[in-house]
Amino acid sequence: MAPPPARVHLGAFLAVTPNPGSAASGTEAAAATPSKVWGSSAGRIEPRGGGRGALPTSMGQHGPSARARAGRAPGPRPAREASPRLRVHKTFKFVVVGVLLQVVPSSAATIKLHDQSIGTQQWEHSPLGELCPPGSHRSEHPGACNRCTEGVGYTNASNNLFACLPCTACKSDEEERSPCTTTRNTACQCKPGTFRNDNSAEMCRKCSRGCPRGMVKVKDCTPWSDIECVHKESGNGHNIWVILVVTLVVPLLLVAVLIVCCCIGSGCGGDPKCMDRVCFWRLGLLRGPGAEDNAHNEILSNADSLSTFVSEQQMESQEPADLTGVTVQSPGEAQCLLGPAEAEGSQRRRLLVPANGADPTETLMLFFDKFANIVPFDSWDQLMRQLDLTKNEIDVVRAGTAGPGDALYAMLMKWVNKTGRNASIHTLLDALERMEERHAREKIQDLLVDSGKFIYLEDGTGSAVSLE
């Protein structure tokens, strides 16, 4: 940056005209001073000496110089010394004016740039046409927002206010729950032992010390409510009854509903003895696996006793039997007891055989196309692996089928062709049991029996039982 120009006094360039009363002669004055000096009275430059353009003399005449009047030829003109001084003075004025013209615009540009920077910072806080955010208010500058002072003022929402809302000071009977911030007013509440509600909105009241006689307190005093009292009869007594109902009556109702559901599904018909025994046996399931096994064993023991008793009755039909202490059960009751207890075990021990002595493998093959709707699609490959088909055999069969629905039928046929007479319905059912596909297993059994093609053969009895 160039240094500022030095101050130059205008008087340094001005020559003062000599006093008319001075003793210096005209010639000495001409020799001692330049040919053009500033006149003291006229305020302009007066050239001295002869020649063209000489000023008038004291007589008001224009004429030659003093040397010409004296009869001497005019010599060479002395060098004019006023012109360089005038040129320097004019040059100085142009320089001063030029410097001022450059300084003033630059100063104005600096001020304008400063204002623009301030305006830009305010513009970033609140764009023109939008509300000021919470915690600020509208400034006097358009589009600008000023922040509220913490603990002094606040605004809790977008606004166009020109000043923040003043913070509230808690009263003498209140305490500060939370201080005032730029976005939230002071939160005050009554001091401990006092409260304020809708009935005393202006001041805090003292809490009651206790409940009236015959009443009990159910709620303590808070800054917003007094203590709550209720009558003893409608207080603790009511709560006790509610607790008793919830803890005793509801579980009893659930147990009763469970017993009814168990007895209805027992298959005993209207026989009350059968229903009693079956219901109590099923309730034994709730006590754990040991209780279930004991009940099952008791039922089997009763069934054996019944069979022995019936045989003895047939052998000793003409002799009275002393049946003291022996519980006699009817065949219907025994079947009722054995039915629920051995629902799954009896199916494991009973064999499915073709009716009328038909070939078991060929009869089973008649149902292969229906098994695809019973066995889940995702379990087909696993079932085939349980039936000892290899992965390569499964892939080859799947590749040779026309559609995905025919894959299970083709794989079952592959299984029959591979194992021959060993491909039985029991091998298939056992494979489903190992896969835990019990639902599919039971549906296949029902399908075979309901069709009349298969019947159950009781294990160890040799008698076939049809479930049609």
Swiss-Prot record:
<keyword id="KW-0677">Repeat</keyword>
<dbReference type="InterPro" id="IPR000488">
    <property type="entry name" value="Death_dom"/>
</dbReference>
<feature type="disulfide bond">
    <location>
        <begin position="190"/>
        <end position="204"/>
    </location>
</feature>
<keyword id="KW-0053">Apoptosis</keyword>
<feature type="disulfide bond">
    <location>
        <begin position="167"/>
        <end position="180"/>
    </location>
</feature>
<dbReference type="GO" id="GO:0042802">
    <property type="term" value="F:identical protein binding"/>
</dbReference>
<dbReference type="GO" id="GO:0007250">
    <property type="term" value="P:activation of NF-kappaB-inducing kinase activity"/>
</dbReference>
<feature type="domain" description="Death">
    <location>
        <begin position="365"/>
        <end position="448"/>
    </location>
</feature>
<keyword id="KW-0812">Transmembrane</keyword>
<dbReference type="GO" id="GO:0005829">
    <property type="term" value="C:cytosol"/>
</dbReference>
<feature type="compositionally biased region" description="Low complexity">
    <location>
        <begin position="20"/>
        <end position="34"/>
    </location>
</feature>
<dbReference type="InterPro" id="IPR011029">
    <property type="entry name" value="DEATH-like_dom_sf"/>
</dbReference>
<feature type="modified residue" description="Phosphoserine">
    <location>
        <position position="424"/>
    </location>
</feature>
<keyword id="KW-0488">Methylation</keyword>
<dbReference type="InterPro" id="IPR052491">
    <property type="entry name" value="TNFRSF10"/>
</dbReference>
<dbReference type="GO" id="GO:0036462">
    <property type="term" value="P:TRAIL-activated apoptotic signaling pathway"/>
</dbReference>
<dbReference type="GO" id="GO:0044853">
    <property type="term" value="C:plasma membrane raft"/>
</dbReference>
<feature type="modified residue" description="Omega-N-methylarginine">
    <location>
        <position position="52"/>
    </location>
</feature>
<dbReference type="GO" id="GO:0005886">
    <property type="term" value="C:plasma membrane"/>
</dbReference>
<feature type="disulfide bond">
    <location>
        <begin position="132"/>
        <end position="145"/>
    </location>
</feature>
<dbReference type="GO" id="GO:0045121">
    <property type="term" value="C:membrane raft"/>
</dbReference>
<dbReference type="GO" id="GO:0006915">
    <property type="term" value="P:apoptotic process"/>
</dbReference>
<keyword id="KW-0325">Glycoprotein</keyword>
<keyword id="KW-1133">Transmembrane helix</keyword>
<feature type="repeat" description="TNFR-Cys 2">
    <location>
        <begin position="147"/>
        <end position="188"/>
    </location>
</feature>
<feature type="modified residue" description="Phosphoserine">
    <location>
        <position position="466"/>
    </location>
</feature>
<dbReference type="GO" id="GO:0002020">
    <property type="term" value="F:protease binding"/>
</dbReference>
<dbReference type="Pfam" id="PF00531">
    <property type="entry name" value="Death"/>
</dbReference>
<keyword id="KW-1015">Disulfide bond</keyword>
<dbReference type="InterPro" id="IPR020465">
    <property type="entry name" value="TNFR_10"/>
</dbReference>
<feature type="region of interest" description="Disordered">
    <location>
        <begin position="17"/>
        <end position="82"/>
    </location>
</feature>
<dbReference type="GO" id="GO:0007165">
    <property type="term" value="P:signal transduction"/>
</dbReference>
<feature type="signal peptide">
    <location>
        <begin position="1"/>
        <end position="23"/>
    </location>
</feature>
<dbReference type="InterPro" id="IPR034024">
    <property type="entry name" value="TNFRSF10_N"/>
</dbReference>
<comment type="subunit">
    <text>(Microbial infection) Interacts with HCMV protein UL141; this interaction prevents TNFRSF10A cell surface expression.</text>
</comment>
<keyword id="KW-0963">Cytoplasm</keyword>
<feature type="disulfide bond">
    <location>
        <begin position="148"/>
        <end position="164"/>
    </location>
</feature>
<dbReference type="GO" id="GO:0009986">
    <property type="term" value="C:cell surface"/>
</dbReference>
<keyword id="KW-0675">Receptor</keyword>
<dbReference type="GO" id="GO:0005035">
    <property type="term" value="F:death receptor activity"/>
</dbReference>
<feature type="disulfide bond">
    <location>
        <begin position="207"/>
        <end position="221"/>
    </location>
</feature>
<keyword id="KW-1003">Cell membrane</keyword>
